[in-house]
């Protein structure tokens, strides 16, 4: 059921992309469910066939391995789907990205203005202290 050769090229329209994601989700979950059900059927089956018991056990074990591998493949496909959804949300959520950029730039502007005010205050204090020192130096009798 799970198609092994999925393309990573995304459809252009948002609706088609969401339908594609939904179809992938349904296919992978269906594949996992069907394979799991078949493994359970194999595990409890009492064989009354003409094949020897050893041969039947080997055949059942091989089929279980194949179905387990199909379940793993479907699980990996689901993990890839989750990664694709995360990437889609990160890359196409412009409103949140713009809001975060605006908030950060406003924060940086506020920080810059606070630093500018502190520097101006420090400059003014240093100018006053320098003026006082120069006045003291030039009016001193010890020059």
From Swiss-Prot:
Chief location category: nucleus
Pfam families, per database record: Med22 (PF06179)
Family label: Belongs to the Mediator complex subunit 22 family.
Its biological purpose: Component of the Mediator complex, a coactivator involved in the regulated transcription of nearly all RNA polymerase II-dependent genes. Mediator functions as a bridge to convey information from gene-specific regulatory proteins to the basal RNA polymerase II transcription machinery. Mediator is recruited to promoters by direct interactions with regulatory proteins and serves as a scaffold for the assembly of a functional preinitiation complex with RNA polymerase II and the general transcription factors.
Subunit structure, interactors included: Component of the Mediator complex, which includes at least CDK8, MED4, MED6, MED11, MED14, MED17, MED18, MED20, MED21, MED22, MED27, MED28, MED30 and MED31.
Domain of life the protein comes from: Eukaryota
Subcellular locations according to the entry: Nucleus
Keyword Chaperone found: no
Signal peptide: none
Any one of the GO CC terms: nucleus
GO molecular function: transcription coregulator activity
Record keyword Cell inner membrane present: no
UniProt keywords, alphabetically: Activator, Nucleus, Transcription, Transcription regulation
Organism, scientific name: Drosophila melanogaster
One BP annotation, GO: regulation of transcription by RNA polymerase II
Protein name: Mediator of RNA polymerase II transcription subunit 22
């Amino acid at each position: 059921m799970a198609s092994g050769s999925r393309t990573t090229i995304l459809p252009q329209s948002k609706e088609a992309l969401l339908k594609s994601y939904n179809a992938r989700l349904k296919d992978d979950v269906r594949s996992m469910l069907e394979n799991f059900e078949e493994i359970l059927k194999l595990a409890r089956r009492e064989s009354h066939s003409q094949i020897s018991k050893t041969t039947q056990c080997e055949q059942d074990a091989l089929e279980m391995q194949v179905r387990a591998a199909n379940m793993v493949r479907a699980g990996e496909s689901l993990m890839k789907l989750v990664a694709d959804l995360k990437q889609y949300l990160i890359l196409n959520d412009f409103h949140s990205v713009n809001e975060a950029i605006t908030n950060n730039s406003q924060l940086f502007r506020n920080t810059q203005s606070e630093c500018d005010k502190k520097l101006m205050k420090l400059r003014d204090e240093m100018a006053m202290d320098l003026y006082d020192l120069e006045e003291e130096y030039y009016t001193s009798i010890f020059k």
